């Protein structure tokens, strides 16, 4: 059976992907590269997974994706290179507020090092690279899966460095069997609400939760945009299916919601579910943007200022290719509004646990 190699472990998506692969019997053996500072956490997560799947194994290998041979001991490298048939590259800095130098080192240089490692694998059947739908930067309108066009600008360094990284993976398509995954904004499980950190759409839950003591909670600006949020179970089901689906080889696929909801509808539903009242009035977008430039206010509200840029971004992700392939497996994206109650229940149950909250600077 194929050996799968992971970067990004013990992150939430990597850990859940491994569970999905074991559950689907797509592999019984995983090798995961882990930073030295993450080994205790990684072994803890490994033990949890192996207890769930006692016939499967996870080998933890210490390393660093920003180094040649991923910083792995030479003897270990020689041992594992012939074994790897599927490589999943998920390691990245996902913070919208990340400084450019840190994002470049991990997202761009790290991916370059992973690409070099991929080239050395004689038995590779598939390279599964996790990009983001937001490599589009400030481009608007219909964004196609087949396009990788440099935009006039980016909303943050996360977007810029993921774009640069995807360029480097795209260059491998002529020589390596690979699939590029472009997820939308990922939230917790659609059926349980489970996640391990409150970022992305959870910033707005932080805002609503911390303003609910006010007589009213206003809308933020006047937006006609949609927001593309997908549950982690859709990402897991789709990605594990695509990893063994021949038609996905050589493709770039949007794992985004083909039927996204308007920003105003999403915000209205969040406010109603948290406060049992609908938002009233309207805070001008410029005022909100200006307020979040003040660190104290950002921290008090639990919102990164870069988040606001997505409220007025008018773009639609084309999902034609992804849906065509995924329909073979009967895989569809759960509706955000219909499954939002589970997301909010989980948030409310864990909102006081600081391990879930992102440190706002």
Model-based region annotation:
Residues 241-304, 324, 347, 351, ...:
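Mid/C-terminal beta-alpha module of Rossmann-like enzyme folds, strongest
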Residues 192, 203-230, 234, 238-242:
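A conserved pocket-lining segment of Rossmann-fold NAD(P)-dependent short-chain dehydrogenase/reductase
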Residues 58-109, 119:
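NAD(P)H-binding glycine-rich loop region in Rossmannoid oxidoreductase-like domains
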């Amino acid at each position: 059976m194929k050996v799968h190699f992971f970067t990004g472990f013990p992150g939430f998506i990597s850990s859940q992907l491994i569970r999905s692969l074991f559950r689907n019997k797509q592999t019984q053996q995983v090798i995961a590269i882990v930073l030295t500072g993450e080994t205790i956490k990684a072994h803890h997560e490994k033990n949890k997974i192996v207890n769930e799947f006692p016939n499967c194994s996870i080998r933890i290998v210490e390393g660093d994706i920003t180094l040649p041979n991923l910083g792995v001991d030479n003897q270990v490298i020689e041992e594992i290179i012939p074994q790897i048939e599927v490589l999943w590259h998920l390691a990245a800095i996902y913070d919208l507020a990340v400084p450019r130098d840190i994002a470049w080192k991990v997202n761009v240089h790290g991916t370059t090092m992973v690409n070099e490692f991929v080239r050395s694998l004689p038995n590779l059947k598939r390279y599964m690279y996790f990009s983001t739908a937001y490599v589009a930067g400030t481009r608007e309108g219909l964004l196609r899966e087949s396009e990788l066009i440099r935009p006039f600008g980016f909303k943050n360094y996360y977007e810029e460095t993921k774009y640069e990284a995807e360029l480097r993976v795209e260059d491998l398509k002529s020589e390596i069997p690979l699939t590029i995954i472009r997820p939308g904004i990922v939230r917790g499980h659609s059926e349980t609400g489970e996640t391990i950190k409150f970022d992305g759409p959870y910033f707005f839950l932080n805002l609503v939760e911390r303003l609910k003591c006010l007589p009213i909670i206003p809308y933020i600006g006047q937006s006609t945009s949609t927001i593309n949020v997908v549950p982690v179970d859709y990402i897991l089901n789709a990605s594990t299916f695509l990893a063994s689906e021949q038609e996905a080889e050589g493709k770039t696929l949007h794992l985004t919601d083909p039927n996204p909801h308007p920003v105003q509808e999403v915000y209205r539903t969040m406010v109603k579910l948290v406060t049992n009242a609908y938002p009233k009035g309207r805070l001008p977008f410029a005022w909100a943007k200006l307020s979040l430039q003040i660190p104290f206010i950002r921290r008090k509200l639990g919102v990164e200022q870069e988040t606001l840029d997505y409220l007025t971004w008018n773009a639609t992700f084309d999902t034609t290719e992804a849906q065509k392939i995924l329909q073979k497996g009967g895989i569809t994206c759960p509706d955000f509004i219909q499954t939002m109650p589970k997301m909010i229940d989980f948030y409310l149950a864990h909102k006081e646990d600081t391990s879930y909250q992102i440190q706002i600077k």
